[in-house]
């Protein structure tokens, strides 16, 4: 390779570093899956963001984790497919488009279904572009040649196939059920679209008279308007207060209808009066009770939240207006005898803000029990889906074991239209992939499918299924890992698993990596109402994508929430700045070296041996931790290696040979520096792709881009444990001298005498060999290294492993203060010895811990005892 010019500006500017780089990667096709038969495939499908607008910090976190995994796998030689795509997001998108129309004084009905859908597709195209530009700013290595959308023709085909197949197996049916109903958007809502808020309401206590005139029974409700649809009063079968009333009738006030008193174990005897009114058409629990007792279902509301003909004189009133009126009427009749304040959790529509109405409706459902059973069974086999952290498997199984049928129809226009037609004359239902031949005699179901129905097929529908011969399906399915938040385990993860098992016979992914929610610095959930949301694009503008990504990836452990803090992102920017400055210094001192000239065979300094040993340890640790998705630990490991070992120590020590006259030593140090920087950039690349590519392109390197450079390998022949030990001793000594200087306020520029009392000849020889470093970094006016050195009274001391440091500082120290300091240090070593001896006396620890761990504890004990004895001896001298 030709000599490389260094083109790194003196100052790190994230905007300049990140500008244009993503387009360069795309042009190079580095992110496209190759289908290379000599490589093992590795697949992730992106959780498709809603096409409705901006990505938030949760998306940035989720996609950064996926990018780290896929970049690392690509470097490890896998044929990586990271498939991008977006979700049509039924109600969310329709609500946005309807809002836009409202501003023009129009409704969707003014446009008609076809024109409205045209408008929605336009909206989709515009917002899909926004999302792609945000993915680009984050630096995500997505294969855009395979981008999918949940309403694509291919995915629509998969949706029809699944619907028809489940219908024919009797697993999809049409029936009445209580659903979450939004009276403003006039559609069913999934549980995730309902936001619960604490609301100050009232509990109304009513007396229903017994039909035979022998008394009355007390019930309480928060929704008195629903009493018009009551069809029973329920009590617990074991409740002695009411046993004699079971089977009797009560007369429903206002309505005059007679309804039975029934016994059901669902009733809580301790709550209120122990008797509850049952309205099967307006409450999910009452609906279940109604089914058990064969009660009629009387719906008293219209779809828009007004009262219907069953509400008699209240017909046409809004439900809340009706509540006020009915309360007045019940008070007049003496039925309502108490109103008490009551704070309770009320469901609101996430889209319209309306209070959600539990509402009896004819909808399409998936029969869940048989599908859930297969998913539960899978978790008892070796092929189970691995949850990381594994505690989330319990959450997942608990939901599957207590599953209810899934309402899949939505009263919307935007989405997958249900492939069912009703005969205009006979009412016969026809379900198939294509419309009936005599279409003029049939009317298609106007509803669309729940968005989650198509999302559940995402891992295989995106690969060409139902065409099981599709090359992508055969090569890249099942996928390897799904990265997602714990808040959608039920809505999405579980549904993908049971649909994957039902239609492909395979789990859709091997691992599910769960992350938490992004919270603000005070630990509060980010929300519009609190105004504490943060736009990731603003953070990128201020600090760069690399800083944001590194913070997001390393800021918490799997499954935990993440607290966003600008200070921490700024600290990460400082880390990037440190890397930039260190790399630039190294490159300025490479002397135009080429990749071919890189030679690690020359004679190395102790610092060279040490940094190569530390690099090997770091490669091994980072690789192992990343395989377990412990990215927080990876971050700490890389940070410590880069900031402390590489920048603060090695680069400083490398200045000795780099600025010296020995050309051979210079060449070796340059080679070590280039090799270590190259490997460090590769380790850091999945986290900080932009800055690492920029630096790597300036380093002597081989290959087109760091994105496809091989992942670093441990090279045992470059490790030298003996030299690393020597270096650790040097670092300990230099740190201790700096610490003492700080204590007595003596600047590093002022020379001081330094006596080093070593424990044996071996340590003395090692320090003598590396004396140049001690002279460079400790600035001694006099340097003595021996097994026996003078110990003047007025001296500061420090103890390190294998040596005691004595610094005669006549006139600079206070003997009393030094004794106090040493007594504190003695206390510290006493505690350490006690702690380690307690551990070594523990039978359980000795029996369970690996031999090398026990050996390490014994080594620590010996080290702490030696340090303690040295401090004791020094104290004795000072007190004489």
UniProtKB/Swiss-Prot annotation:
The keyword Ligase applies. It catalyses: tRNA(Val) + L-valine + ATP = L-valyl-tRNA(Val) + AMP + diphosphate. Its main location: cytoplasm. ATP binds at residue 528. Its EC number is 6.1.1.9. Residues 809-880 form a coiled coil. InterPro entries: aa-tRNA-synth_I_CS (IPR001412), aa-tRNA-synth_Ia (IPR002300), Anticodon_Ia_Val (IPR033705), M/V/L/I-tRNA-synth_anticd-bd (IPR013155), Rossmann-like_a/b/a_fold (IPR014729), tRNA-bd_arm (IPR010978), tRNAsynth_Ia_anticodon-bd (IPR009080), Val-tRNA_synth_C_sf (IPR037118). GO terms for biological process: valyl-tRNA aminoacylation. The keyword Iron-sulfur does not apply. Catalyzes the attachment of valine to tRNA(Val). As ValRS can inadvertently accommodate and process structurally similar amino acids such as threonine, to avoid such errors, it has a 'posttransfer' editing activity that hydrolyzes mischarged Thr-tRNA(Val) in a tRNA-dependent manner. Monomer. This is Valine--tRNA ligase. It comes from Geobacillus kaustophilus (strain HTA426). The gene is valS.
């Amino acid at each position: 390779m030709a000599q490389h010019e260094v083109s790194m500006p003196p100052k790190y500017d994230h905007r300049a570093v990140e500008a244009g780089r993503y387009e360069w990667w795309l042009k190079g096709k580095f992110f496209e899956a190759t289908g290379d038969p000599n490589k093992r495939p590795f697949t992730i499908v992106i959780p498709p963001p809603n096409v409705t607008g901006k990505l938030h910090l949760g998306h940035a976190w989720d996609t950064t984790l996926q990018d780290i995994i896929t970049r690392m796998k690509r470097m490890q030689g896998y044929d990586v497919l990271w498939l991008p795509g977006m979700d049509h997001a039924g109600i969310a998108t329709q609500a946005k488009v309807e809002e836009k129309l409202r501003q023009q004084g129009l409704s969707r009905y003014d446009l008609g279904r076809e024109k409205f859908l045209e408008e929605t597709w336009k909206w989709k195209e515009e917002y899909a572009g926004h999302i792609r530009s945000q993915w680009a700013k984050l630096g995500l290595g997505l294969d855009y040649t395979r981008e999918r959308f949940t309403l694509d023709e291919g995915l629509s085909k998969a949706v029809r196939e699944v619907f028809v197949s489940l219908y024919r197996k009797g697993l999809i049916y049409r029936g009445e059920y209580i659903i979450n109903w939004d009276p403003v958007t006039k559609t069913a809502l999934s549980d995730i679209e309902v936001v619960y808020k604490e609301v100050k309401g009232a509990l109304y206590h009513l007396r229903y008279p017994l039909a035979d005139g022998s008394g009355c029974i007390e019930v309480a409700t928060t929704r008195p308007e629903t009493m018009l649809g009551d069809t029973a009063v329920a009590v617990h079968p074991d409740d002695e207060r009411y046993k004699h009333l079971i089977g009797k009738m009560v007369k429903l006030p206002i309505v005059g209808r007679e309804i039975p008193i029934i016994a059901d174990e669902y009733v809580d005897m301790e709550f209120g009066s122990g008797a509850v009114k049952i309205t099967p058409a307006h409450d999910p629990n009452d609906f279940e009770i109604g089914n058990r007792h064969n009660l009629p279902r009387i719906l008293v509301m219209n779809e828009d939240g007004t009262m219907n003909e069953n509400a008699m004189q209240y017909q046409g009133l809004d439900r809340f207006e009706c509540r006020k009126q009915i309360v007045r009427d019940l008070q007049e009749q003496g039925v309502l005898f108490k109103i008490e304040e009551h704070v309770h959790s009320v469901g609101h529509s996430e889209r319209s803000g309306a209070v959600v109405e539990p509402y009896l409706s004819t909808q399409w459902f998936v029969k869940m029990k048989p599908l859930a059973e297969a998913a539960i069974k899978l978790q008892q086999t070796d092929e189970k889906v691995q949850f990381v952290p594994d505690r989330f498997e319990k959450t997942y199984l608990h939901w599957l074991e207590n599953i209810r049928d899934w309402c899949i129809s939505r009263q919307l226009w935007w989405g997958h239209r249900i492939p069912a037609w009703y005969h205009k004359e006979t009412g016969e239902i026809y379900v198939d992939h294509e419309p009936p031949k005599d279409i003029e005699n049939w009317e298609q179901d106007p509803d669309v499918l729940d968005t989650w129905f198509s999302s559940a097929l995402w891992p295989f529908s995106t690969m060409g299924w139902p065409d099981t011969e599709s090359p992508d399906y055969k090569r890249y399915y099942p996928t390897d890992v799904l990265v997602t938040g714990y808040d959608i385990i039920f809505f999405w993860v579980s549904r993908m698993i049971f649909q994957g098992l039902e239609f492909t016979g395979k789990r859709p992914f091997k691992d599910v990596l769960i992350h938490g929610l992004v919270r603000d610095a005070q630990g509060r959930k980010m929300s519009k109402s609190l105004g504490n949301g943060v736009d990731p694009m603003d953070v990128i503008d201020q600090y760069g994508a690399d800083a944001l990504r590194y913070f997001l990836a390393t800021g918490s452990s799997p499954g935990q929430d993440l607290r966003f803090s600008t200070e921490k992102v700024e600290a990460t920017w400082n880390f990037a700045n440190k890397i930039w400055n260190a790399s630039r210094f190294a490159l300025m001192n490479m002397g135009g070296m080429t990749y071919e000239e890189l030679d690690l065979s020359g004679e190395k300094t102790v610092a060279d041996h040490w940094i190569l040993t530390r690099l090997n340890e770091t490669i091994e640790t980072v690789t192992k931790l990343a395989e377990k998705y412990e990215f927080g630990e990876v971050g700490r490991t890389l940070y410590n290696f880069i900031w402390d070992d590489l920048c603060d120590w090695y680069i400083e020590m490398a200045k000795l040979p780099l600025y010296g006259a020995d050309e051979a030593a210079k060449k070796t140090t340059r080679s070590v520096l280039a090799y270590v920087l190259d490997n460090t950039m590769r380790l850091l690349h999945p986290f900080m792709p932009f800055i690492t590519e920029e630096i790597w392109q300036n380093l002597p390197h081989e290959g087109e881009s760091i994105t496809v450079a091989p992942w670093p390998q441990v090279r045992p022949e470059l490790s030298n444990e003996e030299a690393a030990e020597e270096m650790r001793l040097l670092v300990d000594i230099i740190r201790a001298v700096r610490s003492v200087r700080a204590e007595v306020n003596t600047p590093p520029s002022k020379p001081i005498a330094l006596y080093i009392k070593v424990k044996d000849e071996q340590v003395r020889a090692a320090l003598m060999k590396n004396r140049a470093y001690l002279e460079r970094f400790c600035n001694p006016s006099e340097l003595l290294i021996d097994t026996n050195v003078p110990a003047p009274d007025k001296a500061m001391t420090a103890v390190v492993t294998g040596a005691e440091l004595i610094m005669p500082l006549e006139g600079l120290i206070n003997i009393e203060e030094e004794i106090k300091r040493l007594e504190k240090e003695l206390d510290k070593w006493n505690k350490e010895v006690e702690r380690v001896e307690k551990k070594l006396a523990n039978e359980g620890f000795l029996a369970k811990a690996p031999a090398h761990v026990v050996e390490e504890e014994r080594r620590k004990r010996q080290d702490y005892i030696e340090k303690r004895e040295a401090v004791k001896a020094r104290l004795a001298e000072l007190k004489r």
